[in-house]
């Protein structure tokens, strides 16, 4: 196995930069950089490092050596903590590249080696990637649970039950003339039924884990000049949309990313949906607005308190569902009695975006819907499509199983189910999917 290295911290100015080296030559490389031979595993040393050929001083650093297998990758590993200087990073990188037998790591290669050395399964490796990319508290909770083996524990439990069924059935394949005892038949049938129901229910999760991982899309919908862009700017706490009293100012979809209650929200401000426009660009904006609303996880539909009759049109009303927040904006400009019937009919919140009236209620409603759509349960969620695909295949094989069929074929259905579950964790030969998973890691991880 080659020795690899990379800067694990972000490149640029910082208090500290961390370089990681993994492989059989790790300790030798550290000795070349420091001129010291007596490093002990798991002790931090304050050292000077130099360019091996010229002995030019690179930096005063902290170094630590982890002897195999007691390291992240399971190999000999060295970490070098330098000052976070671009110049130091460049000089040290060049010095390492000039040492024979060491090369720059590929994206995700350290984690890939850890997986190949049985430090964790594939679901945990994916959890580490999600942990690095997590931007909100809820994304962190989901990722840390997966990185710490909760998904592996769940899938391992299912796989163990499947292997138990296989072992019970295979004992009778070589003796076709013998009847399978009722106790064995009952155990196989009961376990099979429980697994079918459990995996079916698990797949019927409304993609909560994937929503939390990628972010919930929230579309702000309404007629022209109702205050959608002003609401977007309030939610983002900065101006990212042009605010104007001219109808049709927003002609395309404007996006912003937000953390509400720990949930990742992707905000979309859309073009106003109103009367038929003769402007081709505006027509396209309206078409995109309706499509955006139809694919959004959460919708905010805004009505104009001064123009309720024109605000409420069929295109907008048809978009209302259980995950829609309806609001009447500009309530400061009209008497409350004039909006009472509409407020009750569509369960609207009364707000004024311009004067910051009741806007906290919008945030609370967004958080409540997000929690309902992607809130936590005791059972860890499916977090990406790869898992879902294998689980659907597993369920297909599992439902095809029948003891009325040939025993060999019935056992093969269970074996294929176990293989699909195993593929999620990487306990079978999955070389073809490793590249796809680890290419999404950053260099140095």
Curated annotation (Swiss-Prot):
Record-listed (6S)-5-formyl-5,6,7,8-tetrahydrofolate binding positions: 20, 79, 119, 445
Coiled coil, from the record: none
Domain TrmE-type G: 215-371
Gene3D superfamilies: P-loop containing nucleotide triphosphate hydrolases (3.40.50.300), Probable tRNA modification gtpase trme, domain 1 (3.30.1360.120), tRNA modification GTPase MnmE domain 2 (1.20.120.430)
Keywords on record: Cytoplasm, GTP-binding, Hydrolase, Magnesium, Metal-binding, Nucleotide-binding, Potassium, tRNA processing
Broad class of the protein's primary localization: cytoplasm
Localisation per UniProt entry: Cytoplasm
Protein name as annotated: tRNA modification GTPase MnmE
Top-level taxonomy: Bacteria, Pseudomonadati, Pseudomonadota, Alphaproteobacteria, Rickettsiales
């Amino acid at each position: 196995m080659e020795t690899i290295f990379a800067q694990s911290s972000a490149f640029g100015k910082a208090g500290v930069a961390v370089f990681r080296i993994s492989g059989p030559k790790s300790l030798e490389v550290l000795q070349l950089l420091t001129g010291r031979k007596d490093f002990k595993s798991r002790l931090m040393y304050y050292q000077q490092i130099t360019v091996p050929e010229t002995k030019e001083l690179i930096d005063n650093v902290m170094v630590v050596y982890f002897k195999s297998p007691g390291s992240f990758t399971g190999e000999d590993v060295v970490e070098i903590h330098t000052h976070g200087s671009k110049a130091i990073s460049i000089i040290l990188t060049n010095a390492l590249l000039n040492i024979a037998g060491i090369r720059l790591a590929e994206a995700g290669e350290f984690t890939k080696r850890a997986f190949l050395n049985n430090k964790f399964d594939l679901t945990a490796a994916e959890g580490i990637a999600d942990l690095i990319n997590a931007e909100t508290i809820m994304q962190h909770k989901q990722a840390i649970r997966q990185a710490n083996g909760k998904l592996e524990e769940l899938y391992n439990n299912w796989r163990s039950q499947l292997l138990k069924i296989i072992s019970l059935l295979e004992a009778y394949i070589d003796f076709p003339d013998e009847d399978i005892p009722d106790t064995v038949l009952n155990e196989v049938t009961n376990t099979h039924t429980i697994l079918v129901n459990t995996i079916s229910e698990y797949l019927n999760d409304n993609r909560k884990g994937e929503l939390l991982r990628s972010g919930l899309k929230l579309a702000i919908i309404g007629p022209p000049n109702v205050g959608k862009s002003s609401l977007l700017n309030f939610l983002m706490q900065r101006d990212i949309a042009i605010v104007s009293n001219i109808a049709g100012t927003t002609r395309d979809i404007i996006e912003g990313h937000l953390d509400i209650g720990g949930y990742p929200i992707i905000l979309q401000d859309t073009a106003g949906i109103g009367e038929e426009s003769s402007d081709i660009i505006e027509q396209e904006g309206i078409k995109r607005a309706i499509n955006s609303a139809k694919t959004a996880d959460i919708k905010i539909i805004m009505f104009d308190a001064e123009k309720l009759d024109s605000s409420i049109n069929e295109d907008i009303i048809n978009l209302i569902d259980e995950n829609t927040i309806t609001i009447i904006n500009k309530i400061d400009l009209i008497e409350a009695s004039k909006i009472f019937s509409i407020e009750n009919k569509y369960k609207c919140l009364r707000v004024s975006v311009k004067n910051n009236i009741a806007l906290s209620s919008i945030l609370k409603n967004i958080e409540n819907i997000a929690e309902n759509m992607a809130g936590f349960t005791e059972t860890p969620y499916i977090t990406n499509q790869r898992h879902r695909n294998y689980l659907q295949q597993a369920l297909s094989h599992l439902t095809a199983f029948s003891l009325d069929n040939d025993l060999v074929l019935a056992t093969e259905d269970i074996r294929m189910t176990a293989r699909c579950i195993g593929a999620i964790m990487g306990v079978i030969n999955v070389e073809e999917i490793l590249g796809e998973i680890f290419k999404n890691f950053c260099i140095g991880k």
